[in-house]
């Protein structure tokens, strides 16, 4: 007899967006898990992958935009790179407070930007960033697999300088896709992500990926596949 299927991360029609900003940011005592509204937002086992994303976003130096702060895993790695400025968008009150405290300790200038990216990104100037790292949590069942495309299409391409690098992830989506539809992570990315990148204006020969081996803990609710994929998307 097979084990019962795990409860999906989102129920049909579920929308966390109205309550997300003010909801408590539940960092556990060991600072290895962050939950908001009961959703598994981030876990420290992701560290090697977050560091790969950070390295990609900071690879051109200069001014880096990070969308979503979480547990500061990627942000701390970005600060180790020879960058000039580090702009960070975060909407949750508790996470933003942690961002403000963290910013005071960093070697490079941090510009904390409070709000949903949908509110903040339109206020940012064109061709302003050398690198972008987008890693926010989906706030509804409707946008579970697609929220990153809205940012990429509406903002990422225009915000990057020519030669700038976009990297991003949606582990909550990709974990589900690798569980239910795909066995090869590169194929998953090619079929579900590349079309949206092309639509946003990026060229196919400027879209690369790197795959790393990383085995999640057995109790991780959102990701079980033993590989992770890092997009490296350059604006021409």
Curated annotation (Swiss-Prot):
<feature type="modified residue" description="N-acetylserine">
    <location>
        <position position="2"/>
    </location>
</feature>
<feature type="binding site">
    <location>
        <position position="50"/>
    </location>
    <ligand>
        <name>S-adenosyl-L-methionine</name>
    </ligand>
</feature>
<feature type="domain" description="RMT2">
    <location>
        <begin position="13"/>
        <end position="236"/>
    </location>
</feature>
<comment type="similarity">
    <text>Belongs to the class I-like SAM-binding methyltransferase superfamily. RMT2 methyltransferase family.</text>
</comment>
<dbReference type="InterPro" id="IPR051038">
    <property type="entry name" value="RMT2/GAMT_Mtase"/>
</dbReference>
<feature type="binding site">
    <location>
        <begin position="171"/>
        <end position="172"/>
    </location>
    <ligand>
        <name>guanidinoacetate</name>
    </ligand>
</feature>
<feature type="binding site">
    <location>
        <position position="46"/>
    </location>
    <ligand>
        <name>guanidinoacetate</name>
    </ligand>
</feature>
<dbReference type="InterPro" id="IPR029063">
    <property type="entry name" value="SAM-dependent_MTases_sf"/>
</dbReference>
<dbReference type="InterPro" id="IPR016550">
    <property type="entry name" value="GuanidinoAc_N-MeTrfase"/>
</dbReference>
<keyword id="KW-0489">Methyltransferase</keyword>
<dbReference type="GO" id="GO:0005737">
    <property type="term" value="C:cytoplasm"/>
</dbReference>
<dbReference type="GO" id="GO:0030731">
    <property type="term" value="F:guanidinoacetate N-methyltransferase activity"/>
</dbReference>
<dbReference type="GO" id="GO:0040014">
    <property type="term" value="P:regulation of multicellular organism growth"/>
</dbReference>
<dbReference type="GO" id="GO:0005634">
    <property type="term" value="C:nucleus"/>
</dbReference>
<dbReference type="GO" id="GO:0006601">
    <property type="term" value="P:creatine biosynthetic process"/>
</dbReference>
<dbReference type="InterPro" id="IPR026480">
    <property type="entry name" value="RMT2_dom"/>
</dbReference>
<dbReference type="GO" id="GO:0032259">
    <property type="term" value="P:methylation"/>
</dbReference>
<dbReference type="GO" id="GO:0007283">
    <property type="term" value="P:spermatogenesis"/>
</dbReference>
<feature type="binding site">
    <location>
        <begin position="117"/>
        <end position="118"/>
    </location>
    <ligand>
        <name>S-adenosyl-L-methionine</name>
    </ligand>
</feature>
<feature type="binding site">
    <location>
        <position position="20"/>
    </location>
    <ligand>
        <name>S-adenosyl-L-methionine</name>
    </ligand>
</feature>
<feature type="binding site">
    <location>
        <position position="135"/>
    </location>
    <ligand>
        <name>S-adenosyl-L-methionine</name>
    </ligand>
</feature>
<comment type="function">
    <text>Converts guanidinoacetate to creatine, using S-adenosylmethionine as the methyl donor. Important in nervous system development.</text>
</comment>
<feature type="binding site">
    <location>
        <position position="135"/>
    </location>
    <ligand>
        <name>guanidinoacetate</name>
    </ligand>
</feature>
<comment type="subunit">
    <text>Monomer.</text>
</comment>
<keyword id="KW-0808">Transferase</keyword>
<feature type="binding site">
    <location>
        <begin position="69"/>
        <end position="74"/>
    </location>
    <ligand>
        <name>S-adenosyl-L-methionine</name>
    </ligand>
</feature>
<dbReference type="GO" id="GO:0009887">
    <property type="term" value="P:animal organ morphogenesis"/>
</dbReference>
<keyword id="KW-0007">Acetylation</keyword>
<comment type="pathway">
    <text>Amine and polyamine biosynthesis; creatine biosynthesis; creatine from L-arginine and glycine: step 2/2.</text>
</comment>
<keyword id="KW-0949">S-adenosyl-L-methionine</keyword>
<protein>
    <recommendedName>
        <fullName>Guanidinoacetate N-methyltransferase</fullName>
        <ecNumber>2.1.1.2</ecNumber>
    </recommendedName>
</protein>
<feature type="binding site">
    <location>
        <begin position="90"/>
        <end position="92"/>
    </location>
    <ligand>
        <name>S-adenosyl-L-methionine</name>
    </ligand>
</feature>
<feature type="binding site">
    <location>
        <position position="42"/>
    </location>
    <ligand>
        <name>guanidinoacetate</name>
    </ligand>
</feature>
């Amino acid at each position: 007899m097979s084990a019962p299927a795990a409860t999906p991360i989102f129920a049909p029609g579920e929308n966390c967006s109205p309550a997300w900003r003010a909801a408590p940011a539940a960092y556990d005592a060991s600072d290895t898990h962050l939950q908001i509204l009961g959703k598994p937002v981030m876990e420290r086992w992701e560290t090697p992958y977050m560091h790969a994303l950070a390295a990609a976003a900071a690879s051109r130096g200069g001014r880096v935009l990070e969308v979503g702060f979480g547990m500061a895993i990627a942000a701390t790695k970005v600060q180790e790179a020879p960058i000039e400025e580090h702009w960070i968008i975060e909407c949750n009150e508790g996470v933003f407070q942690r961002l403000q405290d963290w910013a005071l300790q960093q070697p490079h200038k941090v510009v904390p930007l409070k709000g949903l990216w949908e509110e903040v990104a339109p206020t940012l100037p064109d061709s302003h960033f050398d690198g972008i790292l987008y890693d926010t949590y989906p706030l509804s069942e409707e946008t579970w697999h697609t929220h990153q495309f809205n940012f990429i299409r509406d903002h990422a391409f225009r915000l990057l300088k020519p030669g700038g690098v976009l990297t991003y992830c949606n582990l909550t989506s990709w974990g589900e896709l690798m569980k239910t539809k795909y066995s090869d992570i590169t194929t998953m990315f090619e079929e579900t992500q590349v079309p949206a990148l092309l639509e946003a204006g990026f060229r196919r020969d400027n879209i690369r990926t790197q795959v790393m081996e990383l085995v999640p803990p057995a109790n991780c609710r959102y990701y079980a596949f033993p590989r992770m994929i890092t997009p490296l998307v350059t604006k021409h």
